[in-house]
Each structure stands twice: as structure tokens, then as C-alpha cells.
């Protein structure tokens, strides 16, 4: 029987000093021997997805203590990718994932916590905490802050649903007036919560449901809705039960590595492909699998992408559909339910809240449940009132969206497309693979060939796009923006948004060893591996080279002969794999430390301590 980890600091004569310090935090004699649960919060006033989390940590703590545990809260950092976008701040976003994972490990191991509740929400926070949970392998429940309500605005007599990306695109569109841009800006992000589309934050919070590490509704219940409070309350009680199951009954099904098995990762990736999740999720899923010592690779993702159809399209792929609409259609459990009906899911994986994922789907899928409580839960609607307060409204939809032929969630028999929402491409330009969000690609450009327009940085590409130097048919190549070359693997939301604003969203391609925001749409191919800084072929592309992209056949090729590529490689080896232009970029010691150990995207951009 495993001993409670916390006994290291709470039992024995030699721990008198430690107990004295615990007492100074409020613990009493009766608390020693109870499971000590870390409440890992990520409250910050910098990030709208986290502004409402301040009191939620203590809400969970109270429920933990009511259930017989001892709760101790601490905070991690949280970077807002939208605010950090378009300047050197974006260099810090992906590295913050590792910093978050490390800080959770430091706090939990230093104080010998027995289990943890992870209160996350936005882009790198959920992945960082997920990596930590699999690294530590102690009982863990995830509960996120929830999605933002979609913005609503009336322009020229017509109502539009909005999100952050709409504001960025409008600002770069010369045809939209300053006044309309101001209206869109003020309406795009009306409430607290993670940005309202199927961007990275919401994608990752949805995937925790498929992995079995969070409660049903975690990915889709609005941050503002009173129903979301139940998730926090239940998480507090559930984590104490999981801790007791493991430490007192030796039940390994309470541990993250048992729950998040290879089969669970296959479920999560199947969901990601079916819902057209952010391409960033591929990075994070690979990194989490690495931490859990799960043999899950790009090859597994490629295999899944060839057989899992696209069952849902949400902004940015479908601009008028947001997370509130996914929830009304039954949320993640209903997408999983459709995958289950199609034989595309592993039903037997355990979860933190049900014996198996199959049991959970049978109860929580609105098309098969017999529970009025479950159906009412998914009727939770946006309140339509700007606020930064959690659980502040109780609006309900009159009806659920159960239309599986034409609704927000489709059946396997009536998919948006038979090919899934994400695809892995390979070829001489990306020997180890690259990723495209096919759910956001217009059917007319699934096969595309064009001349390369080569840029050594995101900034240089943006200047060219805004100066109207990019023409229909071009392939924009942005390199030396990978994990090592950036460093930090910046998101390319501004280049893709500006292409869209220039009317080139369906007329150009963009290829990079960097990555894309979950808000990106169009023929945007990222994570090219190996990256340029690691000797990848993308570093050999020259202005005017023809690049061929074939999504149906999963290929991406540089139309240059092997002899010429060999000559270019020898030349590049001699000069070093670095940008040909000097970049005005402040690469600090912290970023240099990250770059020293960063791997390319096909490995999840994890650190390789044997790399030096």
C-alpha cells in the first residue's frame, strides 16, 4: 500500500520543525494524516481567461476540506498569447509551458503534496499543468476557467457573432472604417473566459475530457454560467476520493498515467481531429505523452487523421459558431458519442469520474442519455452581458441542438468532411512532418502549387503582406521561427490574419517552422520539422522555388533536384544554420536556456537534455 507522500513532512519526531511551519499555515493536530491536496491555480489580471479565477481556488479548497482533505493553494504564471502576439513577447509563450510544468513539479515535490486540482484555462497553462500531472503521476483533476461568451455586434443592420480574430482581421482591412473597427474591438471579447472559438485554450480543455482527467462539460460550459460552479465543487470532493483510492486502497486507476494511457491519447487525438482543434494541440499532446512515457508519435496522429472524419466546425473554421454552440449541441461528450457510434473510440479507458469513458458517454451524450439533469446542463446559454465575474448568469437555451445531419455536431454518416480536421504532411520539405488544420482550408486549395516568397522572420513577412507584395498563388515561407530558431516558436496569427484581410485567405499558402494560433484559418502549414535551425530543408528554400502541397495525399514537396539541394546544404553547413538577415530580436538568457535544449515540433518541442 503506498504511503501518503505528505507523511514525509507531517510524521515523526524529526519533522517537528516542518509541522511547526504547517501549523503556521493554519493546520491543526487533526489535519496531520489527512491527504494534502495542492490547489494549482493560475489567476492573473493579465489574461481574460484567468481574471475570474482568484476566488475559485478557495472555492475548491473549501470543498476539499469539507471532504476530509487539507487544501494548499499556489499559483503559476499565465501568458496571454493574444496580448503577446506580434512582438517579442510571443517568444516567451511556448517556453512558458515548460516553466509552468517545472514550477508545479517544484512546488508539489518540495512540499510532498499527495494530489492536486489544476485550475487552468488558456493556451500554455493547461498543457503545462498536464505535463506536470503526468510527470508527477499523483491523483489529479483538471477544472478550467471555461470559455468566453462570443461577442455580438450589429453592423449596418445585421447582427454578427465575433471573437478576437475578427478584431484583428478588421483592423488590417482598409475597406472597414475606423468606427466599425472600434465597434468590433469593443464587442469581440465581452466576458471573462478563454477566447470563444475552437482556439488552443478551448481545444486543450476539451481534450482533458477525452483523456479522462476532467469532468464532463469542462471544455464547453461558459465561464460566466452558474452551471460551471458545479465542476469546481465536484472537483474538490473528487480529488479527495481519488487520493484515498490510491493511497488507502492501492487503486492505480486513480493515477494520471493509468488514465492517460496510449488508448486515451488516441481518444484525445481522435476528438481533436473530429472537432478541428488548434494545431497547437499536436505539440502539447506529444509533449504530454512524452512526460507520461507514452509511445505516442506523429505516426499515430497521421494514422488517426486518415480515418477520423471532421464532425464539427467552430470559429475560426466557421465564423458564426462558437463554444457556446458546441455546448448546446451536447459538448465534448456528444462529439465523443458520435465517434463511439462510428467505432472510432476506445471505450474502456478509465476516467476520474466514471469507471470507463464508455460509461461516461452513455450518461452524458445528449442523444442517448435518459437524464433530464444532463440535458438541462447542456442548455446553459450565454447571458449577453459583459462581465469579468464567474458564474454570474443562468440563461438557458429553449432547445438543444440534436441535429446530427446539419447541426453543430455531425454524425459519422453526415460529416463536414470524411477527412478529419487536422492532417500530417510529409515530403522533402518536411522530412519529419508538418501539420495543417484542414478544417480551416477551403476545398478549392486542398491541392496547391506556387512560388516561394521567403522570409527570415514573422516581422518581415508581415511588412510584405501589408505592403501588398504578396500576390495570389504565392507560397509564403517563414523560417527560423521554430522552437530553437526563434527561439520560442512564435505563433503566426498576424500573417494569416493579414492575408485574410487582403483577400488572399483562399489564394495563398503559408508554410513555417513556427506555429499558428488556434485562431488561424486558411492554407496554413506549421511545425515544419526539422526546423531550419536544426538543418531542415525549409532552410534551403530560395525565392521563387516551386512548392507543391497535396493535402488529400498528405504530401509537401520542394520542386528542387537532389543535387541542387545537396549543394545548397553544403553551402548552408559552411555558413551555419541561421537567418541570412540580422534580426532585431532581444534573445535573453532565459530564452537562450530554452533554445539550448529545445527539440523540433515533431517531438512536441520538448527539451532534450542530451541535445548538447
Swiss-Prot record:
Gene Ontology biological-process entries: isoleucine biosynthetic process; L-valine biosynthetic process
Modified residues (N6-carboxylysine): 124
Pfam families reported for this sequence: ILV_EDD_C (PF24877), ILVD_EDD_N (PF00920)
Keywords, ordered alphabetically: 2Fe-2S, Amino-acid biosynthesis, Branched-chain amino acid biosynthesis, Iron, Iron-sulfur, Lyase, Magnesium, Metal-binding
InterPro entries recorded: Dihydro-acid_dehy_C, DihydroxyA_deHydtase, DiOHA_6PGluconate_deHydtase_CS, ILV_EDD_C, ILV_EDD_N, IlvD/EDD_N
Subunit structure of this chain's protein: Homodimer.
HAMAP family (UniProt xref): IlvD
Function: Functions in the biosynthesis of branched-chain amino acids. Catalyzes the dehydration of (2R,3R)-2,3-dihydroxy-3-methylpentanoate (2,3-dihydroxy-3-methylvalerate) into 2-oxo-3-methylpentanoate (2-oxo-3-methylvalerate) and of (2R)-2,3-dihydroxy-3-methylbutanoate (2,3-dihydroxyisovalerate) into 2-oxo-3-methylbutanoate (2-oxoisovalerate), the penultimate precursor to L-isoleucine and L-valine, respectively.
Name the UniProt record assigns to this protein: Dihydroxy-acid dehydratase
Native organism taxonomy: Bacteria, Pseudomonadati, Pseudomonadota, Alphaproteobacteria, Hyphomicrobiales
Gene label: ilvD
Amino acid at each position: 500500500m503506498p504511503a501518503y507522500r505528505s507523511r514525509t513532512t507531517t510524521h515523526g519526531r524529526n519533522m517537528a520543525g516542518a509541522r511547526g511551519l504547517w501549523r503556521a499555515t493554519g493546520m491543526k493536530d487533526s489535519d496531520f494524516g489527512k491527504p494534502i491536496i495542492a490547489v494549482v491555480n493560475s489567476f492573473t489580471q493579465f489574461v481574460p481567461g484567468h481574471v475570474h479565477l482568484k476566488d475559485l481556488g478557495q472555492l475548491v479548497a473549501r470543498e476539499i476540506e469539507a471532504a476530509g482533505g487539507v487544501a494548499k493553494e499556489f499559483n503559476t504564471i499565465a501568458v496571454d498569447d493574444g496580448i503577446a502576439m506580434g512582438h517579442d513577447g510571443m517568444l516567451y509563450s511556448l517556453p512558458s509551458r515548460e516553466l509552468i510544468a517545472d514550477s508545479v513539479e517544484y512546488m508539489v515535490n518540495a512540499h510532498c503534496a499527495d494530489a492536486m486540482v489544476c485550475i487552468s484555462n488558456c493556451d500554455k497553462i493547461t498543457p503545462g499543468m498536464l505535463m506536470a500531472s503526468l510527470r508527477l503521476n499523483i491523483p489529479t483533476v483538471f477544472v478550467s476557467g471555461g470559455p468566453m461568451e462570443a461577442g455580438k455586434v450589429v453592423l449596418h443592420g445585421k447582427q454578427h457573432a465575433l471573437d478576437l480574430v475578427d478584431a484583428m482581421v478588421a483592423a488590417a482591412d482598409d475597406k472597414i472604417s475606423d468606427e466599425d473597427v472600434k465597434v468590433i474591438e469593443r464587442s469581440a471579447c465581452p466576458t471573462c473566459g478563454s477566447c470563444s472559438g475552437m482556439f488552443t485554450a478551448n481545444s486543450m480543455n476539451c481534450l482533458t475530457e477525452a483523456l479522462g482527467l476532467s469532468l464532463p462539460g469542462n471544455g464547453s460550459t461558459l465561464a460566466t454560467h452558474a452551471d460551471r460552479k458545479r465542476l469546481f465543487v465536484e472537483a474538490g470532493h473528487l480529488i479527495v476520493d481519488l487520493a484515498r483510492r490510491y493511497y488507502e486502497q492501492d487503486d492505480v486507476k486513480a493515477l494520471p498515467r493509468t488514465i492517460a494511457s496510449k488508448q486515451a491519447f488516441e481518444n484525445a487525438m481522435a476528438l481533436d481531429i473530429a472537432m478541428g482543434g488548434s494545431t497547437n494541440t499536436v505539440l502539447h499532446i506529444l509533449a504530454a505523452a512524452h512526460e507520461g512515457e507514452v509511445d505516442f508519435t506523429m505516426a499515430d496522429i497521421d494514422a488517426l487523421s486518415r480515418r477520423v472524419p471532421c464532425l464539427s466546425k467552430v470559429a475560426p473554421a466557421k465564423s458564426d459558431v462558437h463554444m457556446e454552440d458546441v455546448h448546446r449541441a451536447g459538448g465534448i461528450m456528444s462529439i465523443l458519442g458520435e465517434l463511439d457510434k462510428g467505432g472510432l473510440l476506445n471505450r474502456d479507458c478509465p476516467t476520474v469520474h466514471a469507471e470507463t469513458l464508455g460509461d461516461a458517454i452513455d450518461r452524458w451524450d445528449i442523444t442517448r442519455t435518459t437524464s433530464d439533469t444532463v440535458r438541462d446542463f447542456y442548455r446553459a446559454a450565454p447571458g449577453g452581458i459583459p462581465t469579468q465575474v464567474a458564474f454570474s448568469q443562468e440563461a438557458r437555451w429553449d432547445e438543444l441542438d440534436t441535429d446530427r445531419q446539419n447541426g453543430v455536431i455531425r454524425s459519422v454518416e453526415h460529416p463536414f468532411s470524411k477527412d478529419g480536421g487536422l492532417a500530417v504532411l510529409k515530403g522533402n520539405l518536411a522530412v519529419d512532418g508538418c501539420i495543417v488544420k484542414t478544417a480551416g482550408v477551403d476545398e478549392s486549395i486542398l491541392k496547391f502549387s506556387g512560388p516561394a516568397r521567403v522570409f527570415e522572420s514573422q516581422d518581415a513577412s508581415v511588412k510584405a503582406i501589408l505592403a501588398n507584395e504578396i500576390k495570389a498563388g504565392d507560397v509564403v515561407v517563414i523560417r527560423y521561427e521554430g522552437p530553437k530558431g526563434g527561439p520560442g516558436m512564435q505563433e503566426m496569427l498576424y500573417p494569416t490574419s493579414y492575408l485574410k484581410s487582403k483577400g488572399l485567405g483562399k489564394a495563398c499558402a503559408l508554410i513555417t517552422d513556427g506555429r499558428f494560433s488556434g485562431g488561424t484559418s486558411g492554407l496554413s502549414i506549421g511545425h515544419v520539422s526539422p526546423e531550419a535551425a536544426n538543418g531542415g530543408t525549409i532552410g534551403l528554400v530560395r525565392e521563387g522555388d516551386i512548392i507543391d502541397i497535396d493535402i488529400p495525399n498528405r504530401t509537401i514537396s520542394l520542386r528542387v533536384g537532389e543535387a541542387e539541394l545537396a549543394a545548397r546544404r553544403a553551402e548552408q553547413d559552411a555558413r551555419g544554420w541561421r537567418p541570412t538577415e540580422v534580426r532585431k530580436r532581444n534573445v535573453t538568457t532565459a530564452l537562450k536556456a530554452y533554445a539550448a535544449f529545445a527539440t523540433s515540433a515533431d517531438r512536441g518541442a520538448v527539451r532534450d537534455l542530451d541535445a548538447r
